[in-house]
Swiss-Prot record:
Source organism of the structure: Saccharomyces cerevisiae (strain YJM789)
Protein name per Swiss-Prot or TrEMBL: SWI5-dependent HO expression protein 2
Entry-linked InterPro entries: RNA-bd_She2, She2_dom_sf
Locations listed in the record: Cytoplasm; Nucleus
Motif Nuclear localization signal, residue range(s) on this chain: 15-23
Similarity remark: Belongs to the SHE2 family.
GO MF: RNA binding
């Protein structure tokens, strides 16, 4: 692991990390909110009871992740960096590594959840209910995929730009894209595959903050679009199915 000692743990970097974690918490919360509504509707569909149980398990996992994110306090590392004899005390790696690990954990879970939610579950709903009242919209599925792709890329950027990469931080979807590109002889410099786009290392706190701010803006926009589509879907579920409870 290569470390850039020019980047230290400062109040500025801690504030930046808190903003990054806030985005991850928002991502998790968006799913928790919409899935809870979905689970509530599924309670009245006996043929989908096992699917409902699976979603409950996912929600519990996402809620646990969110609790971990919300309880993380990056500023604690500033106080730990007072001992000048400890060369690692002020290292930015010390605070960013657990965050990178959490991002990897979350996006890998979203990978499984998104596959289940947008593909296999949609087929089960159609085959067991014979209608589309509880299905996702095409637009919501696109938003789910787009948001996921950008969070994966941000996770990849956070790891590779700081040169803290490890096989324990590898993302399956990225490694699969690289493998396919190698087998196909794809020119990475010309591909539009977001996972294959080059990531350059950062060499200062200012550079990391500038690029993180740009990423924050991108992810904020993706989450806003995702929330809009989730709202549309939740309204559809209520209008076509939820009113049956009255």
């Amino acid at each position: 692991m290569s470390k850039d000692k020019d980047i230290k743990v400062t109040p500025g970097t801690c504030e930046l990390i808190e903003q990054i974690l806030a985005l991850l918490s928002r991502y998790l919360s968006s799913y928790i909110h919409v899935l809870n509504k979905f689970i509530s509707h599924l309670r009245r569909v006996a043929t989908l009871r096992f699917e409902r149980t699976t979603l409950i398990k996912f929600v519990k996992k996402l809620r646990f992740y969110n609790d971990c994110v919300l309880s993380y306090n990056a500023s604690e590392f500033i106080n730990e960096g007072k001992n000048e004899l400890d060369p690692e005390a002020d290292s930015f790696d010390k605070v960013i590594l657990p965050i990178a690990s959490m991002f990897v954990k979350c996006v890998e879970t979203f990978d499984l959840l998104n596959y289940y939610l947008t593909q296999s579950l949609q087929k089960e709903i159609l085959s067991k209910t014979l209608n589309e009242d509880l299905t996702l919209t095409a637009e919501s599925i696109l938003a789910i995929d787009d948001t996921y792709n950008h969070f994966v890329k941000f996770s990849q950027w956070m790891i590779e730009s700081l040169r803290i990469g490890s096989n324990l931080l590898d993302l399956e979807v990225v490694q699969f894209a690289i493998k396919c590109a190698d087998e196909d002889g794809t020119n990475i410099g010309e591909t539009d595959n977001i996972f294959l786009q080059e990531i350059l290392p950062v060499n200062s706190e200012e550079e990391f903050q500038t690029l993180s701010a740009a990423w924050h803006s991108i992810l904020d926009g993706k989450l806003s679009a995702l929330d809009e589509e989730f709202d549309v879907v939740a309204t559809k579920w209520h209008d076509k199915f939820g009113k049956l409870k009255n």
